Amino acid sequence: MELTGNLQIVCPIRGQLKVNKRSKDGLTATEEFYRVEAIKFLISKGYPKENFWIEPIIKKFGNSGRNSFRSDFAVLDVPASTISTNEPDDILGHAVIICEVKRDNKKNEYVKNTQVKPMLDFAKKQSTLGLYWDNIEKRVFWIEVTDGIKEIKEGPLTFVPKFGLPIKTTPLTFNTIEPVDSLTETFERIEDILHQASFAPEKRYEIILQLLLTKIFDEHAFEVRGDEPLEIQDYRSLGTSADTTKKKVGDVVKRAISFYGEHLPNKLSDTLPLSGDTLFEILKILAPVKIIHSKRDVVQTFYMKFAKALYKWDMAQYFTPTTVTDFLVDIINPQFGEHIADPACG
């Protein structure tokens, strides 16, 4: 999901597109970039290219259906070429997945509630899945009926089944979580959740450090047991109660702070002061992310963002960019047993 290299987007379904990867600001990705990434992900899960329908009409409204509700794409249980009409009922009768893509996470809950969930309500089959994809969150939605009551459930991307199989809720493992392009954006979203929960800035950064150390501790614990369930999970999607979730996560926090505490500049509490609902929302973002395999520049950018706030350091300088470091190492070509030092002399 990187923005490096050629700025042209090549879609597995439509070929090379006229839209670039980057938006007008030159820094962030376009919505089309994320749509193609979602398509590539599903193809990697065995969903046939010929079964994709780009921008299908999901519902028609108004006089003679003049207004329409579209999704970014749908995956059908038959080749799209076999559907001779663009009528919503014909498409929805074969829809396996309906996807909505956004370029950022700013209105994620609004989009989920007004676009993704209604798409599932319009679906003809109970087995149809909804997919939400943005720069931070990738979530799958499905319908469950219990005692005649329908409920739309939500879970991490790892729940998406291979083509032809039903959805199955399985715990996250070290081998199923993935690094992200921006830890900064991920933790800014977590900071926003804490802000909405009325935590002051200083307390928010303390909680973020607790969460970061706990996540790293958990990943290291399961790195050599890659197929065993992690202790930091998207517990709501697994049907775990809020009280049980708080206890499970709280136990890991205590062990993590005990392990890392003596290496921290300041004493850090080993009690996480979060309500069940707030913890659920944070775990939804944090649990699917693999931090310890993130690239150096991703970790560096994150560190410079949050370390200053955590420890009130006056950082007048920035780390040497990793591109410069890599360039110099390539030129110097150190051999076994040799070391290169960056004296940080300004």
Regions found by a protein language model. Give the residues of each.
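Active-site metal-binding core of divalent-cation-utilizing nuclease and nuclease-like domains
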Residues: K24-L27, E50-I91
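Nucleic-acid nuclease catalytic cores
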Residues: K102-E151
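Acidic-basic catalytic patches of nuclease active cores, encompassing PD-(D/E)XK
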Residues: E2-K59
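Structural motif
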Residues: L27-F33, H195-L209, P273, I292-K295
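Long recognition/docking surfaces used for binding and targeting
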Residues: L213, F217-K308
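Conserved S-adenosyl-L-methionine
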Residues: Q317-G346
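Short, hydrophobic/amphipathic alpha-helical patches that form generic packing surfaces
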Residues: V36-I43, I207-E219
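Short amphipathic alpha-helical segments and their helix-coil junctions
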Residues: T4-S23, V180-F199, I282-K284
